[in-house]
Amino acid sequence: MRRITLSALLLVGASLIAGDAAKDLPKFSGSDYQKYWTDACSRCHGANGSGRDNSGKPLPDNGFDFTDSRKANKKKDSDWVKITLEGKDKMPAFKDKMAPADVEKMIPIMRKFAAK
């Protein structure tokens, strides 16, 4: 019973942390999608999409590794839009930060990491 309670508390805590992380992210405006990746997405996914910093160390909230083409290419564009807008696991929701059409325009940036 203790394990279940502790697990539930950890899950709730992780959800709250992910929610708080989203508050610090800038709202998208304009049309510079690469700049938004750099300003917001790279905080967790890294500048190169790997979830690691330039020295190769995992980022504190290392997100999905877009350079893992086996995993990244399994996802449909609609999956990426849904995950980005609604959030998943450690990924905060961006529905208050970006319009669905803007998320769709970010997908080529996400996909280019798996192509390398």
Show where each model-derived region lies.
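Solvent-exposed, polar/charged alpha-helical surfaces in well-ordered, non-transmembrane soluble domains
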Residues: 31-39, 78, 82, 104, ...
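Sec-dependent N-terminal signal peptides
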Residues: 4-13
